Amino acid sequence: MKPYFFALFAALFLLSCNSTSTQSDVTAVLQWDTVSGVSAGTLLRLDSSHTKGTISARPLDVWLPSTYDGKRKHAVLYMYDGQMLFDANSTWNHQEWRVDEIMDSLIAIKTTLPTIIVALHHGGVMRNFEYFPQKPFQTLRAQFSDSTMAAIASRYGSDTAFPVKSDAYLHYMVDVVKPLVDATFQVYSDKSATAVAGSSMGGLMSMYAIGEYPEVFGTALCMSTHWPGGFSPNEEIPNAFQKYLSENITPDRVGKIYFDYGTETLDAMYEPFQNQVNSVLEANGFISGERWVTQKFPGAAHDEKSWAKRLHIPLTFAFAKQR
């Protein structure tokens, strides 16, 4: 991997965080490596030192489209499960979202704004605990929440459940990653050009991100949203999410929000819950087809190949060219 430096912007970012930062700190923290394996654009990787203890150490990836020249400003999409987005040769299931090809193509035909992708890595076995919306979780009965988290931990090979840390993850996104991205790259920093996206638990986190930080994220793209929360049928978790939606995802607070679901594999669970969510959004005053969209994709499964096939739809919803 080849190093890629942003010395001036790195210095500005670090000095804003810590007035005692040295030039060696700047070099160590903001040396980006160019990562191979993408089919379009350029993928850069920052080492794990940037996390500053906000979450467990992990790298950060930023994808730059072919249009990126360091002069013209771009919109920004923050995406969860960053390990799964670009290269099927490096993913656990040998599938990928094909985000690089799809986004680059949409930009090339002038369907969407020029946009960079910030690929946020999950924490491996901690993924579900990082992506479970914390405020709804805290409303669950203790016995139920404990058993649910224990079952999730067991499913992923852990004897012990981790604490739910989605608030800390959002703090990492908003207070560490976004200032770094805004200082380093030529991007619009306003919420109208800033979106968040994910699938499954990442869909839940996208909803939670715009609910907690509507002043930061103007659009949330929630694909195959995992409304059951765990892996057993239940009503308590979906009800907690719907209460959160009723109180926080309202037209006067948030910009635009997109939901979708398939009908196969894990997605087969979602339609009844998504219909309930649709009713909550309508009661809140959203009008379908305007700032809120829900789409059903018959035959689509709960995997990266299915999400890649329809990714152009939410990307266009978020970044339709208008600037």
Feature map (PLM): residue ranges:
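Positively charged n-region of N-terminal signal peptides that target proteins for export
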Residues: 1-4
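C-terminal motif of bacterial Sec signal peptides marking the signal peptidase cleavage site
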Residues: 14-16
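Non-catalytic cap/lid and distal C-terminal segments of serine-dependent acyl enzymes
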Residues: 21-323
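Sec-dependent N-terminal signal peptides
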Residues: 6-9
